[in-house]
Amino acid sequence: MRQPLLKLAAVTRRFPAGDKDVVVLNNVNLSIHAGEIVAIVGASGSGKSTLMNILGCLDHPSEGTYTVGGRDTHMLDSDELAQLRREHFGFVFQRYHLLPHVDAVANLEMPAIYAGTPRAERHARARELLARLGLADRAHHRPGQLSGGQQQRVSIARALMNGGQVILADEPTGALDTKSGQDVIRILHELNALGHTIVIVTHDKAVARHAKRIIEISDGEIVADRPNRHYAEALAEAGVDAAEAAEASEAAVGESPTRNRHDTPAPPAAVDTDPHVDTGTRTRRFAAGSGRFAEACRMAWIALVSHRLRTLLTMLGIIIGITSVVSIVAIGEGAKRYMLDEIGSIGTNTINIYPGTDWGDSRADAIQTLVPADVAALTEQPYVDSATPETSRTLLLRYRNVDVNALVSGVGDRFFQARGMRFALGVAFDEDAVRRQVQVAVIDQNTRRKLFGATRNPIGEVILVDNVPCVVIGVTADKKSAFGSVKSLNVWVPYTTASGRLFGQRYLDSITVRVRDGQPSAAAEKSLEKLMTQRHGRKDFFTYNMDSVVKTVEKTGQSLTLLLSLIAVISLVVGGIGVMNIMLVSVTERTREIGIRMAVGARQSDILQQFLVEAVLVCLLGGTIGIALSFGLGALFSMFVAQWKMVFSAGAIVTAFVCSTLTGVIFGFMPARNASRLDPIDALARD
């Protein structure tokens, strides 16, 4: 005796309704063999649709067993049930259940995508099926552009995409006119002639008479199961000749009758998880996974494009968040670099030595131990690039009839280099001028404007510094500082000239030491303190390391950037919540689409992937737009703020993309998980 292809044994299905359960199927026993054409007939509410859902592995029995090819479906997990639906069942629904936003070819390709069929192969198969069913010229029409009969033929073609060993047709003619209904019945007869098992669920006895076997169901129980004595007449009415139909339709479905006429074809085994699979299997799995991912990306893009305004509003929070993060980081980096440049202009990598114990020491003026010999000793140290002395007084300057007070500083020839000062006119004095106490002077722009005006060239002019004539040989360039513009008048002369001819003192007010590049500033500071203490016999001085200022500025800049970035991240989180909200709405709107995908064999992971990809795509697009806006803001910033610029780093941009992706994953996961956990029956029933 032949083993049935589909077998229900003592199947009961009940649904909760308040405090009680409603029994929809009661102790149903049914066997269907391969190659049969069966009609399940019953009135509305009789349980026929629930029976079809159990047969198609969309639902499961509350009690009893259902086997497919001898395999108990109760023992299968959700992915294995999806594999059964994908590879052995094809559904033809009364309401067609086609995706409205894609064309006929794309609707047909959907089961093959989840089966891992290569793109070229599934595309060719879809076009072939449409051609054989008379829809070659409608291949790229969307469902809304097709008649009801044409949509049902597309639905039949989709059921055949992966072979369709068992065709489950739920009221296949219910929404069609008479002519279209007859065409659908004829196609089902032709498929049965090829060996497909056909199960027609209907309330119309005129449709049921086209089956070889009629099963009547009432109040959840099978009340009759009999052969159809009028089947031959119905076949003739449909205009189907079995022999001709088999020959003509074999090419239409592309299946071997021999294969489909097996009495007990074995359903596929569970997916092999053996890590020692061969390379070819891994390649096929990778190709199948890539195809599903590409489909998820394509459908996500279609969903976003079909709701442009909603997508833009959803992305707005992400755009604002990413723009804020990238811009704030760029502003912080630009500000930090500008501040460091400003500090560099007054001498970076330098250590200043002053008399006394600290700032404000009342006895500092009485300490006269800093002398030029200390400068010479420091210059000889391996960690010192240069050392320059400094002594200063406020003296009267006179040029012709103009008298002004200015700060006159006696410095060494390396002073200007150590302080990073540039010259607008002339040059600095050299070592020879220092040694010979030459009466030359370098002035700043403020002094130039006071004595000579803004346009006159002062080089070579003689000015009186406290009645000592000095020749102007250089003018330093103006500096626009973040710490404010300097209004004081400054004159620099060789420290030997200042000590011997102007101040009458042999000691120094301070020494500026420039540390060699690559030498640790803190270690150099300790070494020079040790040296100076040895020379003086006691520590009667203190040091001020400019490196500490640099570190303070860097730390302050980092703290400020972090604070502002945290504020911007709040905006990003708000945007992420908006994405989650819209994705939840999208899942609700597309519940029927989810049900269709599950019916044709999509796994829960496929549904999860599709909606997760959609959320990530929204966030990535928002991130890309946000980064572009940040660059635009950077350009505008440069137009209005000339002193410094926003500095964009590759790290900040990569971080922005990572943040937008993580936002999509984190806030898109819950809606995607909700979508993947939908019951396919409930999903298909929703509008």
From Swiss-Prot:
PROSITE patterns: ABC_TRANSPORTER_1, ABC_TRANSPORTER_2, MACB
Pfam families per record: ABC_tran, FtsX, MacB_PCD
Major site of localization recorded for this protein: membrane
GO BP terms: response to antibiotic
Matches recorded under InterPro entries: AAA+_ATPase, ABC3_permease_C, ABC_transporter-like_ATP-bd, ABC_transporter-like_CS, MacB-like_ATP-bd, MacB_PCD, Macrolide_Exporter_MacB, P-loop_NTPase
Region annotation Disordered: where it falls in the sequence: 246-281
Membrane-spanning segments: 312-332, 560-580, 617-637, 650-670
Ranges where the ABC transporter domain occurs: 6-244
Keyword Cytoplasm in annotation: no
Highest rank taxon of the organism: Bacteria
Topology term for the membrane: Multi-pass membrane protein
Residue sites binding ATP per the record: 42-49
EC supergroup of this enzyme: translocase
Localisation: Cell inner membrane
GO CC terms of this entry: plasma membrane
Keywords: Antibiotic resistance, ATP-binding, Cell inner membrane, Cell membrane, Membrane, Nucleotide-binding, Translocase, Transmembrane, Transmembrane helix, Transport
Signal peptide interval: none
Quaternary structure, from the entry: Homodimer.
Function: Non-canonical ABC transporter that contains transmembrane domains (TMD), which form a pore in the inner membrane, and an ATP-binding domain (NBD), which is responsible for energy generation. Confers resistance against macrolides.
Similarity remark: Belongs to the ABC transporter superfamily. Macrolide exporter (TC 3.A.1.122) family.
Protein name, UniProt field: Macrolide export ATP-binding/permease protein MacB
